[in-house]
C-alpha cells in the first residue's frame, strides 16, 4: 500500500488563493456572516472523527459550500476538493491533542488537522477571519490589498539587494581576472546571494497566497531572482575549501548549511567561511584564494557544464585556464578543436570586458 502524501501549509494556502473555487466559497461564507468548519480531505482517518451529519458526494460548488455551512456542523470535501462528501458533521478529534486555541471551532479544527494530516479551515463569524490549520501550523488568510502592499515593499528591498549583489559580483569577477581574490571578497558575494534568496522566499509565499492577483508580482520576482540559485552553486564549486572540485553531495550540503544559518550568522563572515571549510578567524578573511573557473566559464555562451568540468579538473584554477592556449585546451580529453577555440575566445573576451568595466 502506498503512503499518502499529506499537503503542506504552502500547498493548502495555494488551494485557498484568489481565483480558486474554494476561495470563492470562503468569501461567500464571510459575506454571509456565518462561521464554518471545513475539512480538505477524506479517508478512514477523517471518517473516524466524524459524528452525525449526512453523506452527500456531490460536485463541489462555492454556492453549495455556502449553503451547507449555514448549518452548525463541519463540511468534508474529497481530497482533491472536487466533491462535497459530508455535511453537518460533528468533528470529534482526540481531546488530548494539545492546542493553544480558545474557541471551540478553532480547537476542533487544529486537533482534527493534527490527527488526520489534512488541512482544516475554520471561519470565525465574530472576527470575520479565515484560519487554515495544517499539521500543527496555522495561517490566517489576508486580503489581497494588504498582501500586495507588503509584497511591493519587499520587492523594493529585493531590488536594492539585487543592485548591491550585482556590484559585489562584478568586483569579484575583476579580482578573479587580476588574481587577487580574498576570502572576504567571496564571502561578501555569498552573503548577498543568500540575502536575495531569503527575501525572495518571503515574496514567493505572498505570491502563492495572492493566486491570480499575484501574476504581475510573479513576473517581477522571477526577473529579479533569475540565475540566483545557479550563482550560489557556482560560487560553491569555485571556492569550497575541498582540495578537489566539490561533489554534488558536498555542494548540496554546503548550500543546506547556508540555508540553516540564522539571520545574525549571515552577517558574520567568519560563520560563512566555516560553512565553506575555511578558518573562522578574522585574519583569514584577508587570505588570498584562487577560483577554479566554473563561475567565469559559466559566462561563455553555449559552453556545457561537462566541458567546463573537464577543463577545471585539467587546469585546476581560472588563472591556469587564462594562461592556456587553444592547443593546451584541446589537449584535454573530450575537448575538440572547435570547443577549445570557443573557450579560448570566450575567456579572452571575458577578461577584456571585466577589465573594461572598471
From Swiss-Prot:
It is an enzyme of class 2 (transferase). It comes from the Bacteria. Is more active at pH 8.0 rather than at pH 7.0 or pH 6.0. Its EC number is 2.7.7.85. The keyword Nucleus does not apply. One of its GO terms (biological process) is DNA repair. Residues 6-144 form the DAC domain. It catalyses: 2 ATP = 3',3'-c-di-AMP + 2 diphosphate. Magnesium. Can also use Mn(2+), and, to a lesser extent, Co(2+). Cannot use Ni(2+), Ca(2+) and Fe(2+). ATP binds at residues 73, 91, 104-108. GO terms for molecular function: adenylate cyclase activity; ATP binding; diadenylate cyclase activity; DNA binding. Keywords: ATP-binding, DNA damage, DNA repair, DNA-binding, Magnesium, Manganese, Nucleotide-binding, Nucleotidyltransferase, Transferase. Its cofactor is Mg(2+); Mn(2+); Co(2+). Diadenylate cyclase activity is inhibited by the interaction with RadA. PANTHER family: DIADENYLATE CYCLASE (PTHR34185), DNA INTEGRITY SCANNING PROTEIN DISA (PTHR34185:SF3). NCBIfam families: PRK13482.1 (NF010009). HAMAP family: DisA (MF_01438). Homooctamer. Interacts with RadA. Participates in a DNA-damage check-point. DisA forms globular foci that rapidly scan along the chromosomes searching for lesions. Belongs to the DisA family. The N-terminal catalytic domain contributes to tetramerization and the C-terminal domain provides additional dimerization. Both domains are required for full catalytic activity. The C-terminal domain may play a role in stabilizing the active conformation. This is DNA integrity scanning protein DisA.
Amino acid at each position: 500500500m502506498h503512503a499518502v502524501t499529506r499537503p503542506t501549509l504552502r500547498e493548502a494556502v495555494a488551494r485557498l488563493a484568489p481565483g480558486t473555487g474554494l476561495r470563492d466559497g470562503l468569501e461567500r461564507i464571510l459575506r454571509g456572516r456565518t462561521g464554518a468548519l471545513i475539512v480538505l480531505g477524506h479517508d478512514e482517518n477523517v471518517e473516524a472523527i466524524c459524528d452525525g451529519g449526512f453523506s452527500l458526494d456531490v460536485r463541489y460548488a462555492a454556492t453549495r459550500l455556502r449553503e451547507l455551512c449555514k448549518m452548525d456542523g463541519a463540511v468534508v470535501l474529497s481530497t482533491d476538493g472536487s466533491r462535497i462528501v459530508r455535511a453537518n458533521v460533528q468533528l470529534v478529534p482526540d481531546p488530548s491533542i494539545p492546542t493553544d486555541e480558545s474557541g471551540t471551532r478553532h480547537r476542533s479544527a487544529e486537533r482534527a488537522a493534527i490527527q488526520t494530516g489534512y488541512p482544516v479551515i475554520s471561519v470565525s463569524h465574530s472576527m470575520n477571519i479565515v484560519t487554515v490549520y495544517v499539521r500543527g501550523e496555522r495561517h490566517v488568510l489576508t486580503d489581497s490589498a494588504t498582501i500586495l502592499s507588503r509584497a511591493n515593499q519587499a520587492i523594493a528591498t529585493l531590488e536594492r539587494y539585487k543592485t548591491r549583489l550585482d556590484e559585489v559580483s562584478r568586483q569579484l569577477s575583476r579580482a578573479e581576472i587580476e588574481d587577487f581574490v580574498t576570502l572576504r571578497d567571496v564571502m561578501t558575494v555569498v552573503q548577498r546571494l543568500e540575502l536575495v534568496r531569503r527575501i525572495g522566499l518571503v515574496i514567493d509565499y505572498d505570491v502563492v497566497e495572492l493566486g491570480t492577483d499575484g501574476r504581475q508580482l510573479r513576473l517581477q520576482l522571477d526577473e529579479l531572482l533569475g540565475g540566483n540559485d545557479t550563482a550560489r552553486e557556482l560560487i560553491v564549486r569555485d571556492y569550497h575549501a575541498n582540495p578537489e572540485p566539490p561533489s554534488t553531495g558536498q555542494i548540496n550540503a554546503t548550500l543546506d548549511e547556508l540555508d540553516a544559518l540564522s539571520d545574525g550568522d549571515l552577517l558574520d563572515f567568519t560563520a560563512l567561511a566555516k560553512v565553506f571549510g575555511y578558518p573562522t578567524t578574522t585574519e583569514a578573511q584577508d587570505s588570498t584564494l584562487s577560483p577554479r573557473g566554473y563561475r567565469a566559464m559559466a559566462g561563455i555562451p553555449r559552453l556545457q557544464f561537462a566541458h567546463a568540468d573537464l577543463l577545471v579538473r585539467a587546469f585546476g584554477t581560472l588563472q591556469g585556464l587564462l594562461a592556456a592556449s587553444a592547443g593546451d585546451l584541446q589537449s584535454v580529453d573530450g575537448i575538440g578543436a572547435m570547443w577549445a577555440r570557443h573557450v579560448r575566445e570566450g575567456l579572452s573576451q571575458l577578461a577584456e570586458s571585466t577589465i573594461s568595466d572598471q
